[in-house]
Amino acid sequence: MAKQTNTLRIIAGEHRGRKLNFVDAPNLRPTPDRMRETLFNWLQPVIYDARCLDLFAGSGALGLEALSRGASGVVFVEKDAKAAQRLNENLQLLSYYNIKFQTKTDLTLFHGEPDLFY
């Protein structure tokens, strides 16, 4: 039996059709293409230049799609170190270098005054 390759596809925007790998983890289930397409069709009027928050980022499918469609920035929050590392590699592969990345495992990320509003 062939080993399954864990890939996600960017649906639209600058990186349309681009396939990216993500880690094989038992609880990691990227948002399916069709659901992402529907979600971003609804958000299309407001996604350009928006700041987005991808909580429990996992593969980063939602945040990567937002960036490809013109979001000005995304904060990815992911506690799994392997998933976070692969997501960071995918960001670099797509030439997204100034993206905020959090690996905190508790709510200390949200204590105090926010530096950005979403």
Put a short name on every predicted segment:
Residues M1-Y118:
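Class I S-adenosyl-L-methionine-dependent methyltransferase catalytic core
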